[in-house]
């Protein structure tokens, strides 16, 4: 018995996607088991039932959310043209299909990020060369935005700041490897097209009008609700969280005056979302992640990290270091905002 007691078994679980509906169901099962309404055997059975595979409708919705997210990011942050928006949305759907195929194929999943980057860059260059000129970098960045590990970088810094050093460093390493794979895919596709004589025509088309920010924000909020598999009853909450987080970040940047606008805006957005998530968890008795996870998706600096690694591989060391410092600043600002949000309103539990 002493030998058994001194034996430790470590099981490695593959990182899964965020599924807010199943998270809420698991939270409800735990609450009912603690309250004595469910015995352990029945609770365990219900938890096992949560591992059911996605339905055909859920898979189609997930693919569509990739396209909607890419198109909305192209309009909301990059202020590209209508053509760039449409092409980014189509490429986003292609990446959604690749991601769906990789979910059930472990060998494909290892290289899915690089394959997605190759596909996105190749399609953008071919369309720009033979159909209509595009802003290549904007289209590729918008189409890959869901794969860029901004959320992983944020969670890594948050865990490190909470003294969870092992898990934080592991997340940081995973996020950096994803950035390297995405950057490698874009550079490889660019060089491959150049080898075949396919040259993109860079041409600045008229940008989208300013009023498109608001419908793009609503479309992004709906896309995130689908992407994070939120239950229909939680869709209004998710949409409000995304809209409030974005508007708070923009407002915080406008009132910063002499301070850097981006870090101040991200801090204000993180602070408000962190407090809102804890208030929602306390009064609705549901996980605060329903607000926190989709709400900060527009705040995480994943695109900055992608650009930093891209500049580094292009041997533009100065610009890469400058962008890398901006990445660190934004990460610290966002994590600081979330921590102060927890300080204002204490969380109900870790979810």
Q: Where do the model's predicted regions map?
A:
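Generic multipass alpha-helical transmembrane bundles of integral membrane proteins
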Residues: 146-157, 163, 170-263
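Alpha-helical membrane-inserting segments
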Residues: 73-77, 94-103, 119, 123-131, ...
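Core alpha-helical transmembrane segments of integral membrane proteins
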Residues: 56-155, 227-228, 232
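Short juxtamembrane and helix-loop transition motifs at transmembrane-helix boundaries
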Residues: 41-55, 68-80, 95-108, 192-206, ...
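C-terminal transmembrane helix-loop-helix hairpin of multi-pass membrane proteins
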Residues: 139-143, 155-158, 163-181, 207-212, ...
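Cytoplasmic-side transmembrane-helix entry/capping segments in multi-pass membrane proteins
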Residues: 60-61, 87, 108-119, 141-142, ...
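Soluble N-terminal domains of membrane-associated systems
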Residues: 1-49
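Hydrophobic alpha-helical segments embedded in the membrane of multi-pass proteins
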Residues: 64-68, 89-97, 118-119, 214-221, ...
């Amino acid at each position: 018995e002493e030998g058994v007691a001194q034996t430790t078994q470590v099981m490695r679980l593959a990182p899964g996607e965020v599924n807010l509906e199943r998270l809420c169901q698991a939270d409800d099962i735990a609450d009912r088991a603690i309250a004595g309404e469910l015995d352990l055997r029945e609770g365990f059975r219900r938890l096992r039932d949560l591992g059911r595979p996605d339905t055909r409708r859920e898979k189609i919705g997930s693919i569509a959310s990739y396209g909607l997210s890419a198109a909305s990011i192209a309009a909301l942050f990059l202020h590209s043209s209508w053509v760039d928006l449409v092409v980014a949305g189509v490429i986003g759907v292609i990446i959604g299909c690749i991601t769906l195929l990789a979910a059930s194929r472990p060998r494909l999943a290892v290289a899915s990020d690089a394959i997605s980057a190759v596909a996105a860059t190749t399609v953008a260059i071919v369309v720009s060369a033979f159909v209509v000129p595009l802003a290549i970098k904007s289209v590729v960045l918008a189409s890959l935005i869901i794969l860029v590990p901004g959320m992983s970088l944020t969670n890594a810094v948050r865990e490190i700041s909470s003294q969870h050093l092992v898990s934080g460093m592991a997340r940081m390493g995973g996020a950096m490897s994803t950035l390297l794979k995405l950057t490698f895919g874009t550079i490889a596709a660019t060089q491959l097209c150049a080898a075949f004589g396919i040259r993109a025509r860079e041409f600045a088309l008229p940008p989208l009008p300013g009023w498109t920010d608001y419908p793009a924000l609503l479309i992004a909020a709906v896309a995130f609700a689908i992407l994070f598999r939120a239950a229909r009853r939680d869709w209004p909450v998710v949409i409000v969280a995304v809209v409030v987080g974005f508007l708070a970040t923009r407002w915080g940047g406008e009132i910063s005056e002499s301070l850097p606008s981006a870090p101040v805006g991200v801090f204000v957005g993180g602070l408000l979302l962190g407090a809102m998530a804890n208030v929602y968890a306390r009064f609705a008795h549901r996980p605060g992640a329903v607000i926190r996870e989709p709400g900060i998706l527009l705040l995480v600096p994943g695109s900055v990290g992608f650009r930093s690694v891209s500049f580094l591989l292009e041997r533009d060391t100065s610009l890469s270091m400058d962008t890398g410092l901006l990445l660190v600043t934004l990460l610290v600002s966002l994590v600081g905002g979330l921590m102060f949000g927890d300080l204002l309103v204490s969380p109900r539990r870790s979810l």
